[in-house]
Amino acid sequence: MKLFAGNSNRVLAESVAQYLNIPLGKASVRRFADQEIFVEIQENVRGEDVFVLQSTSYPANDHLMELLIMIDAFRRSSARRITAVLPYFGYARQDRKPGPRTPISAKLVANLITEAGASRVLTLDLHAGQIQGFFDIPTDNLYAVPVIARDVKANYATGNCMVVSPDVGGVVRARSLAKRIDAQLAIVDKRRERPGESEVMNVIGDVSGKDCLLFDDIVDSGGTLCNAAEALLNKGANSVTAYITHGVLSGGAVARIASSKLKELVITDSIQPTNAINDAPNIRVLSISDLIGEAIARTAAEESVSSLFD
């Protein structure tokens, strides 16, 4: 077994390698003057079980192209099996046609990874479960819930916690956390009462006096989270903390979170945190390196991965 990494999340890759007690593989990923990407594998991988870790986060197209070229390099170097380890799968929110004459980009990206030569995929908290079926190769979708539940139990009196889904579509995900910490579930329902009016946040469930835990897979602009936190506090919640797997946090999101009524935003390192995120007073990062490392170890040993979540 050998583990390699592109440039998107070297810190996580090094932590995973440490968990596995193996060195991170030697590979050069660099750019020519015209910004074309060039990859050189700097050690023998013939007959090896290769894992290449790369989040296709911002800049998504550069990191995706790095991944595809690395997979091709391993295939042409006679690796026995190539597993693409994608802690964050970019383009996941483009999983359906939003209107006529539009693409399903998540399916296209899955095809590209497969055609480049990947034998299987390991990823984390896909935005939509059906994306797992977009790949024509074995694909394991890991869940951050065990890591998050452990952190909740260490920091909160779970008897007073209420898990909240920030929208109707995330209820199944939120319920999985609520079940693990034995908490009740509430939902924030966004709707426009009349055309042309601003969105209204309706809270389904009694959150009065509760420590509310918003749980979702992606935070991007942060607007929905901040508005949901305000709605919950207006309904009498004691505090609001957000647990989110993938901290995209684009644009002015970090500043928006810092000035919001959220007690804390907790994200994982599926996307490498920026300096601004690390310096933010109310943003904390949980590592998923042990989870990813254990999934890799079990895959290499041909053992069950799903039993990690039993």
Curated annotation (Swiss-Prot):
GO biological process assignments: 5-phosphoribose 1-diphosphate biosynthetic process; purine nucleotide biosynthetic process; ribonucleoside monophosphate biosynthetic process
EC number: 2.7.6.1
Superkingdom of origin: Bacteria
Chemical reaction(s) catalysed: D-ribose 5-phosphate + ATP = 5-phospho-alpha-D-ribose 1-diphosphate + AMP + H(+)
HAMAP family found in the cross-reference section: RibP_PPkinase_B
Binding-site residues, Mg(2+) 2: D167
Keywords noted in UniProt: ATP-binding, Cytoplasm, Kinase, Magnesium, Metal-binding, Nucleotide biosynthesis, Nucleotide-binding, Transferase
Cofactors: Mg(2+)
Binding site for Mg(2+) 1: H127
Protein name: Ribose-phosphate pyrophosphokinase
Quaternary structure and partners: Homohexamer.
Family in the record: Belongs to the ribose-phosphate pyrophosphokinase family. Class I subfamily.
Any one Gene Ontology molecular-function term assigned to this protein's record: magnesium ion binding
Organismal lineage: Bacteria, Pseudomonadati, Pseudomonadota, Alphaproteobacteria, Hyphomicrobiales
Pfam families reported in the protein's UniProt record: Pribosyl_synth, Pribosyltran_N
Subcellular location, record wording: Cytoplasm
Pathway it works in: Metabolic intermediate biosynthesis; 5-phospho-alpha-D-ribose 1-diphosphate biosynthesis; 5-phospho-alpha-D-ribose 1-diphosphate from D-ribose 5-phosphate (route I): step 1/1
Protein task: Involved in the biosynthesis of the central metabolite phospho-alpha-D-ribosyl-1-pyrophosphate (PRPP) via the transfer of pyrophosphoryl group from ATP to 1-hydroxyl of ribose-5-phosphate (Rib-5-P).
Amino-acid positions noted as binding D-ribose 5-phosphate in the UniProt annotation, renumbered to this chain: R192, D216, D220, S221, G222, G223, T224
Keyword Transferase: yes
InterPro entries per record: PRib_PP_synth_CS, Pribosyltran_N, PRibTrfase_dom, PRTase-like, Rib-P_diPkinase, Rib-P_diPkinase_bac
Cofactor: binding comment: Binds 2 Mg(2+) ions per subunit.
Gene Ontology cellular-component terms listed: cytoplasm; ribose phosphate diphosphokinase complex
PANTHER family found in the cross-reference section: RIBOSE-PHOSPHATE DIPHOSPHOKINASE FAMILY MEMBER, RIBOSE-PHOSPHATE PYROPHOSPHOKINASE 1, CHLOROPLASTIC
